[in-house]
Amino acid sequence: TLRTTKDGPRLYNVPVAETEQLFTSAKQGKELTAAQANELLDEFNDDVLRIKATLKLSHATSAGLNLHGQRLLDYDLNHTTINGTFYSPEELTSMEITADIYIDRTNAEVFIDGGAYSYSMGLKPEAGNTEGFHFWGNNIEVKNLEVFRAQSIWK
């Protein structure tokens, strides 16, 4: 979609609206530490999920979310990058980032800050890594965390 920002028109990538019908809410939390968010995610594995999270960094550092050791989100505030690619939020002084992550068995699609930036990646877990989902970063807050399960097409 094309949106007007303070810097002019900008193209945003968002999933089609019909994807909302495919997912049902499974768990949610607000104002969590990384450890609390990790505990909330413990019951979930790398099956078909949608995870929406807002991370607040305490200072200019990096933070993100791993799945079996693979970085689904690596936000480096010092170098203004996401997974090594330049990204600057609309509000330049913001210490927050929002990610809407769609995960199936082989792929993850990630939509940052409402679609201002998006990427797709293959899932390649580290051999022997069984940690599942894991938020990481120095003194981060997970302001909002929502987990959705996909409905089966076989029902």
PLM feature segments, named:
Residues T1-K155:
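Beta-rich accessory regions
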